[in-house]
From Swiss-Prot:
Species name: Thermoanaerobacter pseudethanolicus (strain ATCC 33223 / 39E) (Clostridium thermohydrosulfuricum)
Residue stretches making up the SpoVT-AbrB domain: 5-47, 76-119
Domain of life: Bacteria
Keyword set, alphabetical order: Cytoplasm, DNA-binding, Repeat, Transcription, Transcription regulation
Disulfide bond residue pairs: none
UniProt-recorded name of the protein: Transcriptional regulator MraZ
UniProt gene name: mraZ
Claim: Cytoplasm is one of the keywords in the record: yes
Gene Ontology MF term list: DNA-binding transcription factor activity; transcription cis-regulatory region binding
SUBUNIT field: Forms oligomers.
Length: 143
């Protein structure tokens, strides 16, 4: 399970070190794509196959399903970790996540999220609902 929070700095070429704690579970190659809430999602190749299978079941007749699939897949790239443990985050994905310098990596069960430090701090400090309020509603999700 992917969990924890780590901070790194992106270099001038758009490369960033993937935290060692995540490398073992993600493998040397994985998929990076546009995420929700102005972050990036990182999936192992195995988990990406599961995501693709779910996306294939979405009805083409539904406008929202088509739009989400386009958004999600158009931004997806396969990444390979270099010898220094880094990946290159393409410019379009850095722009989507507003990443300029400092980044936060967050393990979220089956994926890693990559956030601009500033965006993460704003998101986590200004969430409309408290952690306790979210926890109260988890029973509705059978958790």
């Amino acid at each position: 399970m992917l969990m924890g929070q780590y901070e790194h700095t992106i270099d001038a070429k758009g490369r960033v070190i993937i935290p060692a704690k995540f490398r073992g579970e993600l493998g040397d190659r994985f998929v990076l794509t546009k995420g929700l809430d102005n972050c990036l999602f990182v999936y192992s190749l195995e988990e990406w196959k599961n995501i693709e299978a779910k996306l294939k079941t979405l009805p083409l007749t539904k406008k929202d399903a088509r739009a989400f699939t386009r958004f999600f897949l158009a931004g997806a790239v396969e990444c390979e970790i270099d010898k220094q443990g880094r990946i290159l985050i393409p410019a379009n994905l850095r722009e989507h996540a507003k990443i300029e310098k400092d980044v936060i990596f967050i393990g979220v069960s089956t994926r890693v999220e990559i956030w601009s430090k500033e965006v993460w701090e704003e998101y986590s400090n200004n969430t409309d609902v408290s952690f306790e309020e979210i926890a109260e509603h988890l029973d509705e999700l059978n958790i």
